[in-house]
Regions:
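Residue-level signal for inorganic ion chemistry
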Residues: 24, 47, 76, 103, ...
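Short beta-strand-loop/turn "lid" adjacent to the catalytic site in phosphate-handling enzymes
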Residues: 64-101, 129-133, 164-185, 210-215
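Pocket-flanking alpha-helical
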Residues: 87, 108-112, 247-249
Length: 509
């Protein structure tokens, strides 16, 4: 009997291919960085064919490194970042570059809808706020600026769906991706026709993909894909789920009193609810595939991607290589330095808005002095990113329909660092748990494969076997009080500096 599961996860910055055994042990991984294209100001895109080639190459590398016979792969499942767009023809081939969820070209469309009173009404139809990186605004923009693309498109897909189409030819999506994209009435699992007619998207309505369960087997690895990946032709391919949901599932989030925090490229913060949140519409809301819950999410591009930029652009590859030579990741090395300076005073504030913040705020440091060193700077980066998460979490936990959380499941890059994980506990004042294995998106979608192949009856059962808490952190009351004071300074600085950014934007125009 085939004993391995393969999870593919194409995120905003990195694609990961991860091998798991039947009980969820992470056996090996191969990674490829995803280049981002900037064809015009505010436009962020990806070459779909290059992404597929890189993923296929990573699969070959992983199979070779792990010396795994492809016949031992029971099934392959996929995950990927949510929202954005991948438009394909009848053969599953891209008709234009993929659009990232960080794309801002639809800002004018969203502003028009807001002025006309369409945003809230149609947000209620899909149980979440409308925002620029979602397909609705992007499709309207394409209708206005690239009308030929409308005719060339057979189906509107999302990142994971494009990869799956290359694997087996299936053209569909699942409830989590369609829901997170803001195209779906998540209570009915149906595309609301009024939404498309009122927003001028009627020409796209018939191009929306059919929707199925994340745990369905939808095809088999084709002969062509087998040549590209070294997978066995005929290997079952499972539909999979969007990365936000996959990470929550792989973190073992099963109760409304748990807060899922993903500190990766984006700050992603989610809670479970017995019915959709409607009093305070969240940024994202989907039907959760475990326990009959709905997953409500607030987020921003203000998380560990700021630290990764610092490592790449300021520390440079030599520092990363030096850490590796000591058997450390750069997260471990920087966390170790931060741990050495936590007891000394540090008033530096870092605003982690390299990829955009409130009122268009850019990133920056406040309070630097000559006596500060690199460890103080990294500490400020760690703290600023946790504070940005708290901004999102404060919004998520507002309103009478909020969840009452008692603990946190932390995933993403920050979870690799014990010092950073403890900082999340101290800032948020809640116990933090980190589960085994670092690649939660790939693990969550591999769990879909495990259910599809009959290893477990459902995802609830798969979570009991394939998710294990590895580390836990308790908040320190004194540090929590000190961090709340510093967080007040952080929010004050963000609000006070807001008027400065509009003139800067105008100067760039």
């Amino acid at each position: 009997m085939a004993q391995y599961l393969l999870g593919l996860d194409a995120g905003s910055t990195m694609s990961k291919v991860v091998l798991f055994d039947r009980v969820g042990n992470e056996l090996g991984a191969a990674r490829r960085r995803n280049p981002i294209l900037f064809p015009a100001p505010g436009h962020t895109e990806r070459d779909p064919q290059a992404m597929w080639r890189d993923v296929a190459d990573a699969v070959r590398e992983l199979l070779a490194e792990q010396q795994v016979d492809a016949a031992e792969i029971a099934a392959v499942s996929v995950s990927g970042y949510g929202a954005g767009l991948y438009l394909v023809d009848r053969h599953g081939q891209a008709v234009r570059p993929g659009v990232m969820s960080t794309d801002g070209r639809a800002a004018g469309v969203l502003a028009h809808w807001e002025r006309d009173g369409l945003s809230h009404r149609n947000g209620m139809r899909t149980q979440q706020r409308l925002w620029t990186g979602q397909p609705a605004g992007l499709l309207r923009w394409l209708s206005q600026h690239e009308p030929a693309v409308v005719d060339a498109t057979h189906a509107v897909l999302f990142c994971k769906d494009y990869l799956r189409a290359q694997l087996c030819g299936d053209i569909s999506t699942d409830t989590t991706d369609a829901g997170l994209a803001g195209l779906l009435d998540v209570t009915r699992t149906a595309y609301p026709d009024e939404f498309y007619s009122e927003l001028g998207l009627a020409g796209w309505r018939d191009k929306l993909p059919r929707i199925g369960a994340s745990t369905d087997i939808v095809g088999k690895v084709s002969a062509k894909a087998a040549l590209s990946t070294n997978l066995r032709a005929g290997t079952p391919v499972v539909r999979g789920m969007v990365d936000v949901c996959a990470a929550a599932v792989a973190s073992g989030v099963t109760r409304p009193d748990q807060l899922s925090v993903i500190a990766g490229t984006f700050s992603i913060n989610s809670t479970l609810h017995t019915s959709p949140r409607l009093e305070t519409l969240p940024l994202l809301q989907i039907a959760y595939p475990v326990g009959g819950y709905y997953l409500a999410t607030e987020g921003s591009p203000s998380s560990a991607s700021n630290f990764e930029w610092y490592c790449k652009s300021i520390l440079g590859p030599d520092s990363v290589a030096a850490a590796a030579s000591r058997g450390q990741s750069i997260y471990d090395a920087c966390g170790e330095r931060v741990g050495q300076v936590l007891q000394r005073p540090n008033d530096i504030l870092f605003l982690p808005f390299l990829f955009g913040g409130p009122c268009g705020a850019p990133a920056g440091f406040l309070g630097l002095r000559a006596e500060h060193d690199g460890a103080d700077v990294v500490r400020a980066i760690f703290e600023g990113i946790v504070f940005a998460h708290k901004l999102d979490i404060d919004l998520l936990l507002s309103g009478s329909d909020r969840a009452e959380v008692r603990s946190i499941r932390l995933a993403g890059g920050a979870a690799r660092s014990p010092v950073w994980s403890q900082m999340f506990a101290d800032v948020l004042g809640l116990p933090v748990e980190v589960t085994q294995g670092g690649e939660v998106g790939a693990r969550g979608t591999a769990m879909c494969a495990a259910v599809a192949m009959g290893l477990y009856p459902d995802l609830d059962a798969a979570m009991l076997s394939m998710v294990r808490v590895e580390r836990s952190y308790q908040p320190d009351a004194a540090r929590h009080a000190a961090y709340l004071h510093k967080y007040e300074r952080f929010t004050l600085a963000t609000r006070t500096l807001a008027p400065l950014w509009q003139p800067t934007d105008e100067a760039r125009a």
